[in-house]
Amino acid sequence: MDRKVKVVQFGTGKMAVYTMRYVFEKGGEVVGAIDINPNVIGKDIGEIMGKENTGVTVTSLDDAEEMLKNVKPDICVVETMSLLEDVKDALLLCAKLGINAITTCEEAFFPWNSNPNVTKQIDDLAKQNGCTITGSGYQDIYWGQLITSVAGSTQKITKIKGSSSYNVEDYGIALAEAHGAGLTLEEFDKQVASADRISAEERQRVIESGKYLPSYMWNVNGWLCSKLGLTVKSQTQVTVPKTNSKDIYSSTLGKTVKAGDATGMSAVVTTETEEGIKIESECIGKVYAEDEFDKNEWTVYGEPDTTITVARPATVELTCGSVVNRIPDVINAEPGYITTEKMGDLTYKIKPLNEYVK
């Protein structure tokens, strides 16, 4: 491509501050931004990034389609919510207009195993209009490529076990609420945990209905199996609340989470495969106490056993860096809903983004 990659930012919250700056620093340009928050509509994106004004202002969602038709971006970066159902309209709008899209929506990383009908709806429309839709973020490397790379150096694998923790304070209110932060244990049990006390048949019915609430690792395990060529035999999910012995104030929730109430949750996903390899992954998302920090640890068991630990990863920056480095891959990919394990490894882009676009 002999011009700058044109990007529209969908959602201008905490993540967008980094993503938009990274796009400019990688030689792209943000030509539009969309939000529903009346406090940011009309604001210059430079102000949102803490930089000089750019002349590009935030458009309201009501005017999004018209703006997209006018600026004709190469790709939209959708950074709003955590469930496919909640970003569906944004992704379908992109697919309808033939605009590529990449989203940090965690379910979108591999939504075929949690909301196949909506995924197919997006897939069909994207194919019809010649664009690619995908999900990426922190998990693309740290719950995905890092593990499959270790697997590539292993003679025999019997089990893969992973655990990752993160502070829900860093990602905004949608994510915090999705983790049950601030709920009493009774509310958590009713609103979050009870959804997983069901049979495999019932779970499949909920998945087909589009109402399943997957933890992040649910989609990650599906991605790993696809990348490693494994056939899923069964997959289960259990969610348990995390608590603290002292009150913790959450700036994201705008309230104090009382001692003994849920600060978030741990979700454990277990996948059995036809090939005999088990994948067990745990995701811990909560409002951190003062002495807690992010940690990502995975072990590939077999011949030999290998453990990799990433302590205190800058998860927000790594999420946004992954998305921006993926942009050329998305533009180059075949049309449809194409998950990133089919795009090849995520690589560092040393040159301007457009130089990687075929």
Describe each model-derived feature in a short phrase.
Residues 36, 81, 105-109, 138-139, ...:
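Short, ordered loop/turn segments at secondary-structure junctions
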